[in-house]
Regions:
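Conserved strand-helix element at the start of the C-terminal RecA-like helicase core
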Residues: 49-62, 162-166, 203-235
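SF2 helicase catalytic motif II
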Residues: 107-157
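Pre-Walker A adenine-sensing motif
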Residues: 2-23, 41
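Inter-Walker segment of RecA-like/P-loop motor cores
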Residues: 69-109, 238
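Interdomain hinge/linker at the junction between the two RecA-like core domains of SF2 helicases
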Residues: 161-207
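Walker A/P-loop
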Residues: 22-42
Length: 239
């Protein structure tokens, strides 16, 4: 089944005298469309908890910023706070290249007050290890990440796939965690058809009133767009 609004509540102890005594780190492997992000913002909203969400893609960060704020988990987006120190009450969505910004001012003194969310955890670790954009600041990013993860109140990692490499990062940092594997498949039972001919796909698309065609390269998207040759069709690429 999907994770549910209160799924993450089990990873903290019941309140005593109005305070939660213990938070548990958790890594959740769950299929796309099973409510991982939804569970997180309900968890944050219900307790009015401060959080830092780390992402590898700016587009994911922008999407999170929009969804979180629309659903009552108020936060800032790192690109919107350039030029000023972060305050201790600021929840933040930040692309990992800019994680060093967390050390500005006194913000780092309050890491223990924050829940850290690592969405698309597997992709985040892969990006951290291999991205050429981190070539000149990888050590600084690793240092800041370790500091954040070892000092924060709780770590929540989610992805549809979790590799041993991703878990090894937590092990290297000396972080204990619970691993949860959700076996529910969001698209189970949905029929799909494999087509090996681009021309066949294009001909089928032309018959549809509305469609969404996803490609794994900008070049392929442009080829299909040009072949369809319909001014009402919109092409969206990295440019």
């Amino acid at each position: 089944q999907k994770l549910g609004y209160d799924f993450l509540e089990q990873f903290k102890s019941p309140e005593e005298f109005g305070l939660v005594q213990q938070y548990k780190n958790v890594v959740v492997k769950s299929d796309t469309g099973t409510g991982k992000t939804t569970s997180f913002y309900h968890y944050i909203k219900n307790d009015n908890t401060k959080f830092i969400s780390l992402v590898s893609r700016i587009s994911l960060g922008q999407e999170q910023y929009k969804i979180f704020n629309e659903n009552g988990a108020e936060c800032l987006f790192y690109q919107n706070v350039e030029g000023r120190d972060l305050q201790q009450d600021d929840s933040l969505v930040v692309q990992i290249d800019s994680i060093a910004k967390l050390n500005k001012g006194l913000y780092y003194d309050f890491y223990e007050d924050f829940v850290v969310y690592l969405d698309e955890f597997n992709s985040l670790v892969e990006y951290l290890i291999t991205s050429p954009t981190l070539e000149n600041k990888r050590i600084e990013v690793f240092y800041t990440l370790k500091k954040l993860l070892t000092m924060c109140k709780q770590i929540i990692c989610t992805d549809a796939d979790i590799s041993d490499t991703s878990l090894e990062l937590l092990k290297i940092f000396g972080i204990d965690y619970s691993f949860i594997k959700n076996k529910y498949k969001h698209n189970k039972g949905v029929k799909c058809t494999e087509v090996n001919s681009r021309d066949h796909i294009i001909n089928k698309i032309k018959l549809e009133e509305k469609f969404l065609c996803c490609c794994d390269s900008k070049t392929e998207a442009e080829i299909i767009y040009n072949e369809i040759n319909d001014p009402s069709v919109k092409l969206i690429t990295s440019e």
